[in-house]
């Protein structure tokens, strides 16, 4: 009898110890790593979500910009952080699904990171320079087939989502267009406006002002539905290329080993922040659709994205460091 009582007491103490951290969490400031410089889409999304999280938990949420290597450096810093819930990150598709497939990064997103929630998706849009004689996808594909190897597409860098979206276009449409990589979206945009390159995939909010001003011509949007801010632009499905649907996405992650009860608290706080109307409004301006799913669903989503882009990389023969 004493043995049974001792076991029951010990088990109760273990349960109490396991739940205590979550009951007290968060008791101090949370550091939210953004693996990109201030001012970009990743940074804006993180700041809007982080500010509301801070108001919910009555604790500061410090934004820590750790830009470099397309989001890899900041994500590496997160993977090495103490797994106590006080250091988290909102990272992107590039750092969580593409770079680990192409580069020798110091983390495995599925083993070294703990999924918390998929925060938002932002569709990629295909645009052409105004001197390109194509007003829609059918005309663009016909032009490329008539001039194999003569048309080109810009990207924000080798292995970036815009790069792989361009490679996916080549595979899907069976066309030969040349990749022209840049060091970031801004120089790619400058040369698009200067008609030095002919087409590019980029996040919708980056392109929208230039489409409105007539500086670029929209061809298709890589989203399931048309964007409220650009209803005149058809989706890739509407133009007959559903497999070309391409969205940048941003997810909240913690270091692997973060206790499940703390992950649950982080998930609850983040998803609650995403339900606030002002948060939705601010991020809708950025072209972002808020998600807010479970850790398990986000982990499965990351797996599917890694598989998808690994296949594109292989099928397109994209050079990798691995």
Predicted regions and their residues:
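Bacterial N-terminal signal peptides that target proteins for export
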Residues: 1-11
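N-terminal signal peptide c-region/cleavage motif recognized by signal peptidases
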Residues: 16-19
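N-terminal (or domain-start) structured segment
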Residues: 22-112, 150-152, 158, 174-199, ...
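Hinge/capping helix and adjacent helix->loop/strand transition within the periplasmic-binding protein
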Residues: 80-86, 93, 101-187, 236-238, ...
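Short, Asp-centered acidic motifs that coordinate Mg2+ and/or phosphate
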Residues: 85-89, 125, 198-199, 217-218, ...
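C-terminal lobe and pocket-closing loops
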Residues: 121, 207-275, 304-307, 321
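Mature extracytoplasmic/periplasmic domains
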Residues: 276, 280-299
């Amino acid at each position: 009898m004493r043995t049974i009582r001792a076991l029951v007491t010990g088990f109760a103490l273990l349960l109490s110890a396991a739940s205590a951290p979550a009951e007290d969490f968060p008791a101090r400031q949370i550091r939210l790593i953004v693996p990109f410089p201030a001012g970009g889409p990743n940074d804006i999304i993180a700041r809007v979500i982080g500010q509301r999280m801070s108001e919910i938990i009555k604790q500061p949420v410090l934004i820590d910009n750790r830009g470099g290597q397309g989001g890899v450096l900041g994500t590496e810093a997160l993977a090495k952080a103490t797994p106590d819930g006080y250091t988290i990150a909102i990272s992107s598709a590039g750092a969580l699904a593409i770079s680990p497939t192409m580069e020798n990064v110091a983390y495995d997103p599925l083993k070294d990171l703990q999924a918390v929630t998929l925060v938002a998706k932002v569709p990629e849009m295909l645009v052409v320079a105004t001197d390109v004689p194509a007003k829609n996808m059918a005309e663009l594909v016909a032009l490329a087939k008539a001039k194999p190897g003569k048309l080109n597409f810009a990207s924000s860098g080798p292995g970036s989502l815009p790069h792989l979206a361009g490679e996916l276009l080549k595979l899907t449409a069976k066309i030969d267009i040349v990749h022209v990589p840049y060091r970031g979206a801004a120089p790619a945009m400058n040369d698009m406006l200067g008609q030095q390159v002919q087409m590019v995939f980029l996040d919708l909010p980056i392109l929208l002002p230039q489409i409105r001003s007539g500086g670029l011509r929209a061809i298709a949007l890589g989203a399931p539905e048309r964007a409220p801010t650009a209803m005149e632009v058809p989706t890739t499905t509407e133009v007959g290329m559903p497999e070309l649907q391409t969205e940048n996405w941003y997810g909240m992650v913690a270091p692997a080993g973060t206790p499940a009860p703390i992950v649950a608290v982080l998930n609850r706080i983040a998803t609650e922040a995403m339900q606030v109307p002002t948060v939705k409004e601010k991020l809708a301006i950025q072209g972002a659709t808020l998600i807010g799913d479970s850790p398990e669903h986000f982990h499965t989503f990351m797996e599917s994205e890694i598989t998808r882009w690994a296949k594109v990389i292989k099928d397109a023969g994209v050079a990798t460091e691995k």
